[in-house]
Structures are given as structure tokens and as C-alpha cells.
């Protein structure tokens, strides 16, 4: 059996390629040749060309047929067309920007994606909603026009080793710099789906393993547990020698240093349903997300991006600690100036009689008996 991977050198690529080789596929990867990551088996054939140039891709693949082709890079719709009639099972990788509200929360009414969003959720239908998302949605349509039995996998934000936009670096560097505080918006309660590299590769390989189920289907991919932003920060701090710091919660409008972590102009949730891939293909995380975050943090600490380098430029995080300290000081001064009102009859609003946790109503019985 022969397999082709277009790309194969990004964060999830080597895991997918190794999985194909382990399954007995004679595997070829088509990529630019600029990156040759560790972990690609020696037996893998490399075709070096420009995956964004259809004519060069056509020339590189002239006269070849593959049992499986996985397109993770390049001009996805054109590669689907080029491989029409020349592949047994075409798999493509896209992303969550296809969903209305993912990149532009205001495209939904009220703002924000439905939680969770299923594969049949509303997609971007007009460039005014989001230009990138519109192109992603149209690309999906073109893929299935060229490959009616394709499997399309929608990726979330990817994290793990060799991620060129490592969101976790905004946390890890502050720990390495021994920062005593980190600013989070609205208590860090935002939820945003992410996927660890090994978990996403596992999802792709499940679709390869079960073509009778996966052909003609679209699947959301991601970790099964979605951690809040605060949980992400606390998990990474624990993994890095229990770094002691204070999480300073501010309203989103003031928490400007947290923008690179939230990665959108709102704190709306971005969570999808994994029910389809779980029930149809049996997906389960191979690496629990909390362990995956710890691995990612330790990898970043050992492979530190250059200060002011490409990764930090992509993240748009200036790591301006003096400005952050001034913001914290000003915010706390403003909070201290707020006087709470005197409540009518001395009774402040409560949490409701149904709540019986810490700070709630006392137990009606002193004992269980």
C-alpha cells in the first residue's frame, strides 16, 4: 500500500507519517524541503517542491497512484483536484475558522459560537463575516466536489513541540523570567478548544484505519477536555516546579497583556463537539491534555524561542513587564477606591437557595441520619 502526505513536517506531521509507516504503508511526503524534522523514518520518500504551486505538484506526482493521500499543507482544493482519480482515499485537514463566530464573534447573534458547535453548525457564508473563514468554507466545498468520498478533518489551535505560534510561550517565558504575577481577563474563565499534536495525529490515523466509516465525512478534532485559560496557566505553572505567582484578574477591556493568550478581541468560548469522531471512529485522547500541556511547557523551556524573534512576533507579545506592573498598580488603586453600597435591610444578594457549596446556605440537618 502507498501513502502520500502533502506537508508532513509541521507539528502533527511526523506523528502521522510514523503512524502510516507503522501500518505498512510505503510513504511519500511532498514538502518544500526547508524543514526536515526529527522523527521521520528513513524509509520515507521525500519529494521537494512547492506545495502551493499546482503545476509543480502535478509534475512531482505525474503518473503516480496512492491508496491514501493526506493533504495538510499547500493549496488544498487544487491538490484535491490534482489527485482526482489517482487516490483511493483522500483525507484533508482544515480548521475551525470555517465556523461562523470563530474568528468574528459578532457574526453570531448573540455574539459567540454555540457551545459546543457540531460539524453541521453554521459556517461562514459571506466574506463580510470573516474573509479567511469564507475561503476555508469554500475550500471544503471544492474538496468534496473533486473527492466526493474524501474525509475532512477540522483542526483546532494546535499545541505541542515545533508549533510556530506557541501560545503557551506567553506563559512559559513569564515563568522563566520569574514573574510574580500574570494578568488574565475575567478570571481566566474563557474556554477555547485546542489539540495536542499526538492527539490530532491519532484522529487522522483513525480515519485512515476506518475508510468504510470515514469516507465522505467531516470530523471535528481536538482534545476531549477543554481547559479554561486559568486552568492552562495553573497547569503549566505546576509543571514548571510549581512556579509561585498570583493570577491578577481584570475586565477584558483592561487586560491588554492577555490578548496573545486569548487570541481574539472577545472572551467568548470557542468549543466544538467531538461526539461524531468519538462515536464513529472511537476517538479518545492518547495524551491527557494536562499532561500534554506539561510536556509542551517543558519542551518550550528546553527549546526557547529567541527574545523578539519570529515566534514572539507572531504571538504579538512584547513581554513589557514594566507596563504590566504599572497596569496592575493602577487597577488595584482603582479597585480600592470603589465603595460597596449598603444593602437594603443589610441583606446583600446571595447565590440562591439551591446553592449549598462554600458560602451558600447552611445544611438543614446537622447529620445524615
Task: Please report, for each region that a protein language model flagged, where it lies by residue.
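N-terminal Rossmann NAD(P)H-binding glycine-rich loop of SDR-like oxidoreductase domains
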Residues: 3-23
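N-terminal Rossmann-fold cofactor-binding loop
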Residues: 29-34, 51
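Conserved Rossmann-fold cofactor-binding substructure of NAD(P)-dependent oxidoreductases
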Residues: 48-71, 80
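A short helix->loop->beta-strand "cap" motif at the edges of active sites that frequently abuts
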Residues: 85-90, 148
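Active-site "gating" loop of Rossmann-like NAD(P)-dependent oxidoreductase/epimerase domains
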Residues: 95-134, 138-146
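Conserved beta-loop-beta element that borders a ligand/cofactor-binding pocket
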Residues: 139-162
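Alpha-helical substrate-binding/gating segment
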Residues: 173-182, 190-227, 234-238
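Mid/C-terminal beta-alpha module of Rossmann-like enzyme folds, strongest
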Residues: 209-276, 280, 294-295, 307-369
Amino acid at each position: 500500500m502507498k501513502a502520500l502526505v502533502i506537508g508532513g513536517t509541521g507539528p502533527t506531521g511526523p506523528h502521522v507519517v510514523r503512524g502510516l509507516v507503522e501500518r505498512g504503508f510505503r510513504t511519500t511526503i511532498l514538502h518544500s524541503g526547508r524543514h526536515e524534522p526529527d522523527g521521520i523514518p528513513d524509509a520515507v520518500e521525500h519529494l521537494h517542491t512547492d506545495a502551493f504551486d499546482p503545476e509543480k505538484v502535478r509534475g512531482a506526482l505525474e503518473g503516480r497512484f496512492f491508496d491514501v493521500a493526506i493533504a495538510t499543507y499547500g493549496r488544498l482544493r487544487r491538490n484535491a483536484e490534482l489527485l482526482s482519480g489517482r487516490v483511493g482515499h483522500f483525507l484533508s485537514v482544515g480548521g475551525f475558522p470555517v465556523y461562523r463566530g470563530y474568528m468574528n464573534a459578532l457574526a453570531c447573534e448573540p455574539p459567540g459560537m454555540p457551545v459546543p458547535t457540531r460539524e453541521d453548525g453554521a459556517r461562514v457564508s459571506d466574506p463580510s463575516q470573516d474573509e479567511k473563514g469564507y475561503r476555508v468554507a469554500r475550500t471544503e466545498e471544492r474538496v468534496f466536489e473533486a473527492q466526493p468520498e474524501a474525509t475532512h478533518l477540522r483542526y483546532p489551535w494546535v499545541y505541542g513541540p515545533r508549533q510556530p505560534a506557541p501560545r503557551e510561550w506567553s506563559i512559559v517565558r513569564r515563568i522563566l523570567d520569574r514573574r510574580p504575577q500574570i494578568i488574565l481577563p475575567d478570571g481566566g474563565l474563557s474556554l477555547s478548544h485546542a489539540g495536542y499534536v499526538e492527539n490530532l495525529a491519532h484522529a487522522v490515523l483513525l480515519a485512515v484505519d476506518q475508510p468504510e466509516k470515514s469516507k465522505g465525512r467531516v470530523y471535528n478534532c481536538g482534545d476531549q477536555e477543554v481547559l479554561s485559560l486559568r486552568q492552562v496557566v495553573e497547569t503549566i505553572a505546576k509543571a514548571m516546579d510549581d512556579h509561585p505567582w498570583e493570577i491578577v484578574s481584570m475586565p477584558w477591556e483592561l487586560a491588554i497583556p492577555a490578548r496573545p493568550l486569548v487570541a481574539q478581541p472577545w472572551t467568548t468560548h470557542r468549543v466544538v463537539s467531538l461526539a461524531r469522531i468519538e462515536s464513529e471512529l472511537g476517538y479518545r485522547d492518547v495524551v491527557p491534555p494536562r499532561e500534554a500541556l506539561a510536556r509542551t511547557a517543558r519542551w518550550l523551556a528546553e527549546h526557547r524561542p529567541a527574545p523578539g524573534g519570529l515566534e514572539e512576533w507572531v504571538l504579538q507579545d512584547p513581554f513589557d513587564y514594566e507596563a504590566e506592573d504599572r497596569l496592575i498598580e493602577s487597577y488595584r488603586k482603582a479597585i480600592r477606591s470603589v465603595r460597596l453600597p449598603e444593602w437594603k435591610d443589610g441583606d446583600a444578594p446571595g447565590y440562591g437557595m439551591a446553592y449549598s457549596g462554600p458560602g451558600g446556605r447552611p445544611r438543614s440537618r446537622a447529620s445524615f441520619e
